[in-house]
UniProtKB/Swiss-Prot annotation:
Belongs to the CidB/LrgB family. LrgB subfamily. The keyword ATP-binding does not apply. It is found in: Cell membrane. GO terms for biological process: cytolysis; killing of cells of another organism; programmed cell death. This is Antiholin-like protein LrgB. The chain crosses the membrane at residues 7-27, 33-53, 63-83, 97-117, 124-144, 152-172, 212-232. Inhibits the expression or activity of extracellular murein hydrolases by interacting, possibly with LrgA, with the holin-like proteins CidA and/or CidB. The LrgAB and CidAB proteins may affect the proton motive force of the membrane. May be involved in programmed cell death (PCD), possibly triggering PCD in response to antibiotics and environmental stresses. It comes from the Bacteria. One of its GO terms (cellular component) is plasma membrane. Pfam families: LrgB (PF04172). NCBIfam families: PRK04288.1. The gene is lrgB. It comes from Staphylococcus saprophyticus subsp. saprophyticus (strain ATCC 15305 / DSM 20229 / NCIMB 8711 / NCTC 7292 / S-41).
Amino acid sequence: MIEHLAINTPYFGILLSLIPFIIATFLFKKTNGFFLFTPLFVSMVVGIAFLKLTGIDYANYKIGGDIINFFLEPATICFAIPLYKRRDVLKKYWKQILGGITLGTTAALVCIYLIAEAFQFSNGIIASMLPQGATTAIALPVSADIGGIKELTSLAVILNGVIIYALGSKLIKLFNITNPIARGLALGTSGHSLGVSSAQEFGETEASMASISLVIVGVIVVIVAPILATLLL
């Protein structure tokens, strides 16, 4: 019967992505944010499992998946809206914001390298992991330029975002971080676009700070990751 499904049309990839995502979103809200029901994580697992169990080639999924991927960059640009609304905060605290994000992102890149070295990962794997702090649209080209594996980088970016989306807000509440600027910067710097989505649940200030973090982290990754790769790999 599977041969008769419309697997060669864009609808197959789109539905395989959206149906698990919608169901997971419902379950995520019903369970008060249980991390295993994080929509992106569930969609990824269900999609991979379905393709493996049915024997359908990834190329069939990619026809529709590419359409969804097309909207990735325009969706990222939309994060500029809360940033514009709270531009007064950005003007007032721009030194602290820029300094905190720069130090945090650079430290994260160095830590990724040190951990990877400790586990004796190959240079290709290390290069694949270095750009994971940026969005997919930025991380993949950087990974390719420094000798990384784009598929591995994509997985690292997704897992990084899923972890922050699932646990970031809980950690902020656990450590009683009440400053909206600090909350937004923490989520945006560590979790890129999914961190921004998580920050939006707190408020407009958090969302705007997370948005500027996403942009600055991307710029830092583009500059620092190739330098680290040249010096250390």
